Amino acid sequence: QCGFLKVPLDYRHPHGAKISLAVSRIKHTSPASEYQGILLTNPGGPGGSGLNLNAFLIPVLQQEGLTNGPAAANDYDWIGFDPRGVGSSRPALSCLPNYFSYDRPNYIPTTAALVRTWLKRSKAYATACGKKNGRLLAHMTTIDAARDMDSIRAALGQKQITYYGFSYGTYLGQVYSTLFPSHVRRLVMDSN
């Protein structure tokens, strides 16, 4: 199941401008007596799309030989989402479309000229982002992402979440659990 959840652009002004988060859900397949609630995931980044992450994770967990994998896969409603400004969430951040083209210098600058080239391109990228997306950029923080997660929890009518974060998603999970400790049932952090 896929859809959108409208959340405040600025949580200090909850009745002001709204943005739309792209959200997906793969419902639990176990009996209601074994249902464990919702499990939100984040692939990291920051800026990684999490909308389809669960379609990859669930089959991995269902493999034979994993002690608790099938139960984890089947007993939760798995919730994926594209963080604000990412992927299918709207508005989506768009800076310089050709920035990631094939015509760019090496990632590791080996000369002073390459350092200058990267600095010039980085400044141009940041300037273009600021001009085109300044209103959104000011609200693309980890705290905003954590508040978005709590909005997803509330919209689904759940008192708590279980969370599975990878890479930067581990930091996001820590921030969420700091802001909303009573809303965390279980927290799994993988890497970092």
Question: Could you tell me what each predicted segment is?
Answer:
Residues 1-192:
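Gly/Pro-rich cap/lid or specificity-loop segments adjacent to the active site
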